[in-house]
């Protein structure tokens, strides 16, 4: 696919269109295109009622919007059944749901939970909790300094004691894609289930839950241009069916007596309370937008921008990129350190040129410890970034050490 | 507020070549101060004799603002009484919150170079880390016989 760097997609995004912001914090959250903002507005203008309740026209319209979104997501991730798609408020809630409903009920003393060293805290803390309550043991699958998880590491780490493997498809610090299909195969041979955190990958990799054969998958809408506060949990139907509800209350029941309740069928068993229907509608619009642009095109363009930036950074002295040496393994994420300049100072100086980057430990402290740094600066790209964005970033980046009083 | 003006020579000098960033084996007080959200981590050491700060130093790491601010503070409190040091701490924190007079900024000497932090809410914690740790040492040891 040939990508023309001069074609700009900024015009689709009001925040970018109407400003000179150089937005390079896409791994934290993406900007929202007009079509998503308009879809949310239209829901409140024309379809607002409590979905899944009420027998009047408006309530049925709201329900239809919510269910249309579910169908759109099902197709987007290639799930087998619509009821395998559960709306949550984001990746964090999705993983907490799995940990609380599956982990707390199907794990016991001596069972092992395997997570990778590059997990975001949202895929660490729920498992630390499950381990502490059930007596299960939390183990770590380690990568090399380039972020690669080898076949040998996978074979050695997954044993018959392993019950859950929870792993990110794409590290939010390294940008490296993990060999999920390989991990799933080995895990299943040992009778373990696989939970895939797709928060970071969903915008870069075409997710096919059936091809990957993952048992659970979670992502947040806001990283793929939908509103904040809407996310997805995918789970295989046979697993979801045997799990108890996570949250209890309205909308997740068939009937309730003074002492007991019969829970609703999937997916509603896991959607207690009023769904974020406007968020779901926004998510549907975002997926439609992605489909209209083309996932492959978006990714190719992101890789091209990543490479341009990667090559330019490599020419600046005293800057060290974290992870793979090949920019194609970075998937839009370049984390780096600058000798003797703290990432918060880097971020503040870049901010003067309207460049937005993330500084800190990126909610992945175990990875930072493992790779031997306390914090770093991260620039992350999406297809709507431009060559000008990179030029502005690199120009500002090049002057930082001098501004901080160093001679070079 | 332009950052290029903000990272002035006083700040960068104290960050790159701190005078008081070293251990102090005969310290009478030592306290760790941390900003968990951003990773600034210092341990402040004081040698206090008869309520007078005879020496002050710090170790640790963090952003330029946290390091320079701690170094400037150490410079300022050496030779002062506990009460004077606490008065400066209170004044410095007020400066960072944006409610201080020009006379007070003058009295804060080099620490006055950090006054523009009052326009940078994200960096307030970095600037006050050393001073907060100083306050905490004296609050925790109010009854200590020094």
What is the predicted function of each stretch?
Chain B
Residues 69-79:
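Alpha-helical support elements that line or immediately flank enzyme active sites
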Residues 60, 78-79, 130:
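A generic structural motif
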Residues 67-68, 87:
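Alpha-helical macromolecular-interaction surfaces
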Residues 17-56, 60:
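Structured beta-strand/loop patches that form or line metal/cofactor-binding pockets in enzymes
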Residues 61-67:
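Short, thiol/selenol-centered motifs that function as redox-active sites or metal-ligating centers
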Residues 1-25, 82-146:
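C-terminal binding/interaction regions
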Residues 38, 65, 119-123:
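Secondary-structure capping and boundary motifs in well-ordered enzyme cores
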